[in-house]
């Protein structure tokens, strides 16, 4: 749990958390490359969905509601992870941090996901566990949901991210989606 809040910032955040090294440190690139190679080899070791997420996805799918993944994680890691979690063939849109040439908080990745799902951004609900997610969703014209159960890497309290909703478990999304 020590590095949980750093995970949202990827290798950069984890290396800073462990060593205090910024990207301009002489050893940063060596450590980053070693970290990413090890991560790639063990992409799904001890990795699981948040409790209640499987049930939420089944409920969305049973109502034919498109869902997808927009992550700043590079495709090199995103697609194998989705395969191993058995989500690759279920996600309507999977967008990695390098899919569209920019990453969140830029709105382009979430707009690409909406395009793939053939939805207007105003019809989308973007759920994220980092302030960058909320900023990206808002910039794209989507309703936003802050997932307090996630990694939440921002220094700003989640209540100050400006999300339309805050949820504490995946099942908290159900009344937001279905209006009940």
Task: Report the location of each language-model feature.
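A generic helix-loop boundary/linker signal
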Residues: 4-5, 25, 29, 43, ...
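Small/polar loops that bind or transfer phosphate-bearing groups
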Residues: 7, 69-70, 128-129
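Asp-based, Mg2+/Mn2+-dependent phosphohydrolase catalytic module
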Residues: 37, 58-61, 75, 79-180
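Residue-level marker of alpha-helix boundaries and capping positions
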Residues: 47, 69, 123-125
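Residue-level marker of regulatory loop/turn positions in helix-turn-helix DNA-binding domains and
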Residues: 49, 70, 102
């Amino acid at each position: 749990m020590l590095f949980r809040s750093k995970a949202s910032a990827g290798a950069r955040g984890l290396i800073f958390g462990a060593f205090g090294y910024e990207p301009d440190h002489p050893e940063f690139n060596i450590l980053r490359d070693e970290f990413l190679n090890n991560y790639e080899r063990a992409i799904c070791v001890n990795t699981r969905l948040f409790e209640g997420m499987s049930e939420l996805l089944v409920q969305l799918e049973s109502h034919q509601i498109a869902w997808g993944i927009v992550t700043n994680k590079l495709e090199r890691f995103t697609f194998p992870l989705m395969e191993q979690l058995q989500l690759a063939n279920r996600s309507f849109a999977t967008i990695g941090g390098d899919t569209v040439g920019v990453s969140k908080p830029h709105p382009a990745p979430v707009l690409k996901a909406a395009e793939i799902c053939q939805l207007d951004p105003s019809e989308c609900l973007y759920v994220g566990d980092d302030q960058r997610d909320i900023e990206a969703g808002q910039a794209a014209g989507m309703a936003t949901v802050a997932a307090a159960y996630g990694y939440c890497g921002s220094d700003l309290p989640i209540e100050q991210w400006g999300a339309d909703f805050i949820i504490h478990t995946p099942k908290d999304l159900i009344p937001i989606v279905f209006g009940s």
